[in-house]
């Protein structure tokens, strides 16, 4: 059976999603992006769609087509079309009363209808889904703005047919967003009003829906077909053109390439300012060899766009007036469109409704595709009883894990894992003869536990005396369908066990905090990875030094090593250990160099001794350092020890 998908065919970006295994998956494209630009470009040699088309738009403006959604299903003499055509860098001409787009392709002049251009974008979305699902995709639910008339809807359906899709249904974008939040399920307490605030890349739509037992009625719509993220980008671009002029006495406003590079940087800065209070822009050789380095704060950005931001409230008032209801009668407000990530917009909307909580837990640029995928699953009968009830509660919103040596967050359940789920890993002790371990449970995306949220902790004591790395402690995380987490620890030698239960409300984060943490985590990811690598290098050096110490003092080996060698090696080990104690904040490179130094002393001595013992050749990797795969291998030792200093055996992470 072919799989059904939901496609949000947007003015500037499109998105595709699929419903399977009781959850919706937003499908990323070959660039790893979860939304794909609705761009098609024609060159001398090829046709490009999506990111590849948008990326070359600056070099090839006349043959790069976008905003086809503004033309689809309209007549050439439509005032909207006439107005839009003035601003497009590509040619729009009249063909039998309809607008068609004229481009140069492989050396010839070609014309394409808006339906054909949209069908190319839909084909791209279909291919993205097929690449991920590994099978043909035929059936799709495609979304359109609520104000689209019959001919625009039919033209969109035709675009789907051209793309080889069986369009199951054309549904309204606000309806799809409401379905995504399961608002059709919220209590069958008769009709309730839902306001959908959709601020996208190029358009702004506000819709008021009345939902009654799964029936959606569009009560009123309003908006601005020319207000969106691109306008905010323009304000930034103009601001920086002036700044460049002030600093360098040069005007870049006529140089297309410089403008395109500046616009790309501005779009990126705008996105960053949704999660951080300021950001920097660095463009090498922007114009006539001059580098442009500057920064902008969130406050300044909000000031530059203040009138645009405020103007988004006018259509909200209009929709309420048209539907003849008071704002206190609106039960749910749903944010859709990437531009609703802007904190100031969220605040304006919330304040307008007297501080009401907004629905924004689904990525705003994905909510429409999400709802379309649910609708597609329902229409193809590809659902389960569970679907209907816990459509949106079926993933762990943040990674869950425990703290291991060095304050490192070791994740057992990664974020977005489908729940219920169960996962076990084996850990060991950090010090010789350690009597107990403290199991601390955290949620969050950062590499160090201090940056994450502590959910609870418990002690597992009564571990019999043993060298570090020998005891095996199995930690199990188990989340049930209600999101309640049970964490247990079992010491395999004695069978001792301890557990803790963490319920949803106790110490868990709110949705807003989750969104904030996830966006911060992206920002900090690089620093985090560096820090994790540094701690890993430190732990590896420490483990190596201690396992060497065990090796030369262990019964079989100590007789094989000459007194001089033993003294030399012991001195090197002790120096390394005391250097480690004094150098907790050294760099990855320093730890690695120190390890190499120690290896250069140890390897010849150990291999000589192994030769004498007739054991396995190679240096004592002993039990390798922490990090990598926690496997619970017992401590290193005699001639059967791992070969080579860089042992390839499983690594054991240690719990303080």
Curated annotation (Swiss-Prot):
<dbReference type="InterPro" id="IPR018181">
    <property type="entry name" value="Heat_shock_70_CS"/>
</dbReference>
<dbReference type="InterPro" id="IPR043129">
    <property type="entry name" value="ATPase_NBD"/>
</dbReference>
<dbReference type="GO" id="GO:0052553">
    <property type="term" value="P:symbiont-mediated perturbation of host immune response"/>
</dbReference>
<dbReference type="InterPro" id="IPR013126">
    <property type="entry name" value="Hsp_70_fam"/>
</dbReference>
<keyword id="KW-0547">Nucleotide-binding</keyword>
<dbReference type="GO" id="GO:0030445">
    <property type="term" value="C:yeast-form cell wall"/>
</dbReference>
<comment type="function">
    <text>Acts as a highly immunodominant antigen. HSP70/SSA1 and SSA2 bind histatin-5, a peptide from human saliva, and mediates its fungicidal activity. SSA2 facilitates fungicidal activity of Hst 5 in binding and intracellular translocation, whereas HSP70/SSA1 appears to have a lesser functional role in Hst 5 toxicity.</text>
</comment>
<comment type="subunit">
    <text>Binds human histatin-5, an antifungal peptide from saliva.</text>
</comment>
<protein>
    <recommendedName>
        <fullName>Heat shock protein HSP70</fullName>
    </recommendedName>
</protein>
<dbReference type="Pfam" id="PF00012">
    <property type="entry name" value="HSP70"/>
</dbReference>
<dbReference type="GO" id="GO:0009986">
    <property type="term" value="C:cell surface"/>
</dbReference>
<dbReference type="GO" id="GO:0044409">
    <property type="term" value="P:symbiont entry into host"/>
</dbReference>
<dbReference type="GO" id="GO:0005737">
    <property type="term" value="C:cytoplasm"/>
</dbReference>
<dbReference type="GO" id="GO:0044183">
    <property type="term" value="F:protein folding chaperone"/>
</dbReference>
<comment type="similarity">
    <text>Belongs to the heat shock protein 70 family.</text>
</comment>
<dbReference type="GO" id="GO:0005524">
    <property type="term" value="F:ATP binding"/>
</dbReference>
<dbReference type="GO" id="GO:0016887">
    <property type="term" value="F:ATP hydrolysis activity"/>
</dbReference>
<dbReference type="GO" id="GO:0042026">
    <property type="term" value="P:protein refolding"/>
</dbReference>
<dbReference type="GO" id="GO:0005576">
    <property type="term" value="C:extracellular region"/>
</dbReference>
<dbReference type="GO" id="GO:0009277">
    <property type="term" value="C:fungal-type cell wall"/>
</dbReference>
<dbReference type="GO" id="GO:0009636">
    <property type="term" value="P:response to toxic substance"/>
</dbReference>
<feature type="region of interest" description="Disordered">
    <location>
        <begin position="608"/>
        <end position="656"/>
    </location>
</feature>
<dbReference type="GO" id="GO:0042277">
    <property type="term" value="F:peptide binding"/>
</dbReference>
<dbReference type="GO" id="GO:0140662">
    <property type="term" value="F:ATP-dependent protein folding chaperone"/>
</dbReference>
<dbReference type="GO" id="GO:0030446">
    <property type="term" value="C:hyphal cell wall"/>
</dbReference>
<dbReference type="GO" id="GO:0034605">
    <property type="term" value="P:cellular response to heat"/>
</dbReference>
<dbReference type="GO" id="GO:0005829">
    <property type="term" value="C:cytosol"/>
</dbReference>
<dbReference type="InterPro" id="IPR029047">
    <property type="entry name" value="HSP70_peptide-bd_sf"/>
</dbReference>
<keyword id="KW-0134">Cell wall</keyword>
<dbReference type="GO" id="GO:0051701">
    <property type="term" value="P:biological process involved in interaction with host"/>
</dbReference>
<keyword id="KW-0007">Acetylation</keyword>
<dbReference type="GO" id="GO:0062040">
    <property type="term" value="C:fungal biofilm matrix"/>
</dbReference>
<keyword id="KW-0346">Stress response</keyword>
<dbReference type="GO" id="GO:0031072">
    <property type="term" value="F:heat shock protein binding"/>
</dbReference>
<dbReference type="GO" id="GO:0044414">
    <property type="term" value="P:symbiont-mediated suppression of host defenses"/>
</dbReference>
<feature type="compositionally biased region" description="Gly residues">
    <location>
        <begin position="611"/>
        <end position="647"/>
    </location>
</feature>
<keyword id="KW-0963">Cytoplasm</keyword>
<dbReference type="GO" id="GO:0005634">
    <property type="term" value="C:nucleus"/>
</dbReference>
<keyword id="KW-0067">ATP-binding</keyword>
<keyword id="KW-0964">Secreted</keyword>
<dbReference type="InterPro" id="IPR029048">
    <property type="entry name" value="HSP70_C_sf"/>
</dbReference>
<dbReference type="GO" id="GO:0051085">
    <property type="term" value="P:chaperone cofactor-dependent protein refolding"/>
</dbReference>
